[in-house]
Amino acid sequence: MCVYCAAGPTHPELLELAGRVGAAIADRGWTLVSGGGNVSAMGAVAHGARSRGGYTVGVIPKALVHRELADVDADELVVTDTMRERKQVMEDRADAFIALPGGIGTLEEFFEAWTAGYLGMHRKPVVMLDPFGHYDGLLDWLRGLIDTGYVAQAAMDRLTVVTEVDAALTACAAGMAGQDMTGETMAGETMAG
């Protein structure tokens, strides 16, 4: 389960959400794949998973090892040469994606996973967990682009937006079981468990 999230803000509600997501992933016996930082929501999601005995994989570019304080407690810490390589490793290691409230880094990772899913490059669930309305303006703007042809309705349909942790994980469950969003087996795609 790949979780995209912030590496800067320390808002208590964000850290609590990230910790609950990590714990819920571990409670289901799933592996957490995250950005490999030990700060903000990125650190909280990993700590949450480990607090329940979960297995964590952190993926961080060399350039961010000190800036984001690499999560040296991760069960696996993968250090990549570039941000692009980081995203590829995270996508390859994951069976589903959840984006928590975050900034441009979170959005960049999320948009790449969402776009790849929409274009048929993978059939993994892509979920936005937004209990605070953080992304409301962005989602309204994207929906507004449907009428002008800049965003296809099928692209919006490929994204699941929820406000509850359990709903996010339920939306990801098919991918974590090796199935796509329709229940079909994802042949040829790696199941990270």
Annotate the PLM regions.
Residues 78-117:
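Internal catalytic-core helix/loop-beta-alpha segment
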Residues 92-96, 147-193:
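A charged, well-structured terminal subsegment
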Residues 40-47, 134-146:
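Glycine-rich, charge-decorated loop segments at or immediately adjacent to ligand/cofactor-binding or catalytic sites
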Residues 1-55:
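Glycine-rich beta-alpha loop segments
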Residues 6-9, 38, 62-64, 102-106:
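Short glycine-rich anion-binding loops that position phosphate/pyrophosphate groups of nucleotides
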Residues 60, 100, 107, 114-140, ...:
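Short, acidic/small-residue loops that bind anionic groups at enzyme active sites
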Residues 34-83:
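Glycine-rich, small/polar surface segments that engage phosphate groups of diverse ligands
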